[in-house]
Amino acid sequence: MGATGDAEQPRGPSGAERGGLELGDAGAAGQLVLTNPWNIMIKHRQVQRRGRRSQMTTSFTDPAISMDLLRAVLQPSINEEIQTVFNKYMKFFQKAALNVRDNVGEEVDAEQLIQEACRSCLEQAKLLFSDGEKVIPRLTHELPGIKRGRQAEEECAHRGSPLPKKRKGRPPGHILSSDRAAAGMVWKPKSCEPIRREGPKWDPARLNESTTFVLGSRANKALGMGGTRGRIYIKHPHLFKYAADPQDKHWLAEPHHMRATGGKMAYLLIEEDIRDLAASDDYRGCLDLKLEELKSFVLPSWMVEKMRKYMETLRTENEHRAVEAPPQT
């Protein structure tokens, strides 16, 4: 029996091969030695995983990537809350769209008008998270052309009030920076931009029934700014632009000069002004010019008369403001 037991002892390693544990020598009786290759593989894989985690940590130190990962996680919840807000005001958009369809005609797509209005709301909401230095010049360019009469004056006074507060709150060394000084030099002419609305281009006599006009959206594309809606009004605030009222837009939609836009703003520009800009040094040789986008047209006498009065109002307003400016300072 003893010989048989000695003969069967070499079969012990096969137990280790099957996944068992191999005992140590007699002096180390009771201790387990982890010589199983499977255990070695587990330890090796754990080291590799730790290595991967460390690599991922170092590759995600970019702030933009980290913030975008967080945004991706929160985006579904944000979208749900945004949808809840729009559902709250959807009844107003629906009533307005149906009213537009009743006034303009059945060819108006009410659902499309609602979608465009919602997208416009989201675009305007972006301004809540814009840098203050970028938003203020934009408002300075856009508001004088959109607001009329006393509204423009009140808005200009409202915009001018925060400026002294910013100067008082900043340390003197911050203002003496060369970049800030250059920006300040540009800011002053922009704030006084409405005074430049004079001269031959702002003479109402130049408007008659043979004057050709273009849509502001087409002028934007013709000057190579098609990707940014309304950029032409920001870059060239001195241009005369006329905001079409519902009666004007109804006439424009009938000859198919423009689509029925409902409540969306539609501006008319003088074709001659746009072509003069295209021939100026700022655009001469520009590869993005697409003057074929200028689909010009003439307007009826009643609409031209409204545009003359509007131009005269702006000229008179600017002349009064230029006279009243010295006593205010």
Curated annotation (Swiss-Prot):
GO terms for molecular function: DNA binding; nucleosome binding. The modification Phosphoserine is found at S161. One of its GO terms (cellular component) is histone deacetylase complex. Keywords: DNA-binding, Nucleus, Phosphoprotein, Transcription, Transcription regulation. Signal peptide: none annotated. InterPro entries: DNTTIP1_dimer (IPR041384), TdIF1 (IPR026064), TdIF1_C (IPR049121). Residues 1-22, 147-178 are annotated as: Disordered. Residues 56-147 are annotated as: Important for dimerization. Pfam families: DNTTIP1_dimer (PF18192), TdIF1_2nd (PF21229). Residues 159-173, 216-237 bind DNA. Residues 197-316 are annotated as: Important for DNA and nucleosome binding. A motif (Nuclear localization signal) lies at residues 164-170. Its main location: nucleus. Monomer and homodimer. A minor proportion may form homotrimers. Interacts with ZNF541. Interacts with the terminal deoxynucleotidyltransferase DNTT. Interacts with TRERF1. Identified in a histone deacetylase complex that contains DNTTIP1, HDAC1 and MIDEAS; this complex assembles into a tetramer that contains four copies of each protein chain. Component of a histone deacetylase complex containing DNTTIP1, ZNF541, HDAC1 and HDAC2. Identified in a complex with KCTD19, HDAC1, HDAC2 and ZNF541. The N-terminal domain mediates dimerization. The C-terminal domain mediates interaction with DNA and nucleosomes. It contains a HTH motif that mediates recognition of the consensus sequence. Increases DNTT terminal deoxynucleotidyltransferase activity (in vitro). Also acts as a transcriptional regulator, binding to the consensus sequence 5'-GNTGCATG-3' following an AT-tract. Associates with RAB20 promoter and positively regulates its transcription. Binds DNA and nucleosomes; may recruit HDAC1 complexes to nucleosomes or naked DNA. This is Deoxynucleotidyltransferase terminal-interacting protein 1.
